[in-house]
Amino acid sequence: MSRVCQVTGKGPVTGNNISHAHNKTRRRFLPNLQHHRFWVESEKRFVRLRVSAKGMRIIDKRGIEAVLADLRARGEKF
């Protein structure tokens, strides 16, 4: 399973660990992904999504119905 938010599309990015001596080693910054169940009132069921913390805030703001409509338009499975 890929580490990508289903709502925002955020995935891992690469960068450097920098030590006190300023030695650089490559690393990955991973998104804050959570499996979360959202209640969809119109369908009378829970939908389980893998979303980032930012994705949860978007769902809080726009509503789960609007976000699911966008996911269905993109052909996303959930």
Swiss-Prot record:
**What are the record keywords, sorted?**
Ribonucleoprotein, Ribosomal protein
A biological process (GO) of this protein is: translation
- List the taxonomic lineage: Bacteria, Pseudomonadati, Pseudomonadota, Gammaproteobacteria, Pseudomonadales
The family database entries (Pfam families) matched by this protein are listed as:
Ribosomal_L28 (PF00830)
Return the similarity comment.
Belongs to the bacterial ribosomal protein bL28 family.
A GO molecular function held by the record:
structural constituent of ribosome
Transmembrane helix as UniProt keyword: no
SUPFAM superfamilies with a match to the protein in the record: L28p-like (SSF143800)
> Could you name the Gene Ontology cellular component terms for this entry?
cytosolic large ribosomal subunit
Its name, as the record gives it, is Large ribosomal subunit protein bL28
